[in-house]
Regions:
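N-terminal segments that mediate ammonia production and transfer
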Residues: 2-231
């Protein structure tokens, strides 16, 4: 008996159904065991419900890119994870270049003059509503900045629209959102070095805050901290 494939004949030998079933069962058990040991996905892998990209082909900055990014979020609303409550999803956001001119104007209102672009970083931070826990988180962030030899330039309260439709559960968990501005220290000569320092600062502060076992410490989160981009 033979079967033609791409013009070539290969012999086919019949195999009993019982043998095939037994072999498949063994393979399945081995696969399940392997998955139980290491998990279904590699630890370094991350997934997103929906992702879109907008860029200027010549690298020029434009507010239209942000507008188009917001339009993408609306267009992929069906890809967002939503539970029984349609007003409670798993979150969404934009990753953009640091808007230097905007931040420069905003921080000038506090009397803070930002260094040139690339010589400062911005951390977007979710903080607990409870005052004592929030202050403890901010203090640990400031300690981490100082310990790494960098400069605390100041904090900025991020304005939010609380009139947006929101479920009671989401409103209860809504964080205080602040941005921390960090200037480069004397030991930092290039943006790549500052980017690495910001990574260390974020990890150091987060680890310390976790170890404090604050009443509302789980509400602390840093979506981004960089001298190039912000979420």
């Amino acid at each position: 008996m033979s079967q033609a494939t791409s013009g070539t004949s290969f012999p086919i030998f019949p195999v009993s159904d019982a043998a095939t079933t037994a072999t498949s069962a063994v393979a399945t058990r081995q696969e399940i065991q392997a998955a139980a040991e290491v998990g279904l996905y590699a630890n370094a892998e991350h997934d997103a419900c929906g992702v879109g990209f907008v860029a200027h082909i010549k690298g020029q900055k434009a507010h239209s890119i942000v507008r188009q990014g917001l339009q993408i979020l609306e267009n992929i609303d069906h890809r967002g994870a939503v539970g029984a409550d349609p007003l409670m999803g798993d979150g969404a956001g934009l990753l953009i270049q640091i808007p230097d001119e905007f931040y420069r104007a905003e921080m000038a209102k506090q009397g803070v003059e930002l260094p040139p672009p690339g010589e400062y970083g911005v951390g977007m931070i979710f903080l607990p509503k409870e005052s004592a826990s929030r202050q403890a988180c901010e203090q640990e962030m400031e300690r981490a900045i100082k310990a790494e030899g960098q400069v605390l330039l100041g904090w900025r309260d991020v304005p939010v629209d609380r009139d947006m439709p929101m479920s009671p559960l989401v409103r209860e968990k809504e964080p205080v959102i602040r941005q921390v501005f960090i200037g480069r220290g004397h030991d930092i000569l290039v943006p790549d070095a500052l980017e690495r320092k910001l990574f260390v600062i974020r990890k150091t502060a987060s680890s310390k805050i976790q170890s404090l076992n604050l009443t509302h410490g789980s509400e602390y989160y840093v979506p981004s901290m960089s001298c190039r981009t912000i979420i």
